[in-house]
Structure formats: structure tokens, C-alpha cells
From Swiss-Prot:
Top-level taxon in the UniProt lineage: Eukaryota
UniProt-recorded name of the protein: Small ribosomal subunit protein bS18c
HAMAP family, per the entry: Ribosomal_bS18
UniProt cross-references to SUPFAM superfamilies, sorted A to Z: Ribosomal protein S18 (SSF46911)
Gene Ontology MF terms in the entry: small ribosomal subunit rRNA binding; structural constituent of ribosome
Length: 108
């Protein structure tokens, strides 16, 4: 058999299949906070389906459960810890330029 006519075969690499993040016994519900908190970022955002490795149906159910938990205030809308940190105040500049313009207009 000629080399050009031979089919090119790649060696198949074995890969370990990841376990699904949601087991068959887990209920996707707004009260199941331990499950819901796995699919929320540190900022409080809902993680995407690619990051979560969920099916479309599971992602939809998780999203609905997170939104219900937020509305019932068992989960915050935002996780802003920076909100309470005090930042250094910047010195305010006085409007000397604006005053000079006003004075110049009054003199003319």
C-alpha cells in the first residue's frame, strides 16, 4: 500500500471523565443554599454554564433558584465587601479658574 493512500490515524488518548457537579439526589431548590452557593462567584454573580459544567436544563433551574433566593433575601444580590472599606479622600480643588473667568466677565 502506498504511503499517500494510507489513512492517517491519530492515537486516541484516554481521558478521565469529570463527575457532574450536581448529583442525582441533589434537589435544585432555592432553599438548598449549599448547592446554590457552589454556582455563584465571589462577587455574587451567577457563573456561566461552561464554568459550572452543567446541562442547559440544570443551568436554567440553578439560575431560577438563585433568583428566587435573592428575592426572598436568603442570598444577597451583590457580595460587596468593599462597600464598607474606607477609601482615602482626595483633596478637592477650589475653582480658582472659574472665579477668574467670572471676575473677568464682570470687569468687561
Amino acid at each position: 500500500m502506498d504511503k499517500s493512500k494510507r489513512t492517517f490515524r491519530k492515537s486516541k488518548r484516554s481521558f478521565r471523565r469529570r463527575l457532574p457537579p450536581i448529583g442525582s439526589g441533589d434537589r435544585i431548590d432555592y432553599r438548598n443554599m449549599s448547592l446554590i452557593s457552589r454556582f455563584i462567584s465571589e462577587q455574587g454573580k451567577i457563573l456561566s454554564r461552561r464554568v459550572n459544567r452543567l446541562t442547559l436544563k440544570q443551568q436554567r433551574l440553578i439560575t431560577i433558584a438563585i433568583k428566587q433566593a435573592r428575592i426572598l433575601s436568603s442570598l444577597p444580590f451583590l457580595n460587596n465587601e468593599k462597600q464598607f472599606e474606607r477609601t482615602e479622600s482626595t483633596p478637592r480643588t477650589t475653582g480658582t479658574r472659574a472665579r477668574k473667568k467670572k471676575i473677568g466677565l464682570l470687569l468687561n
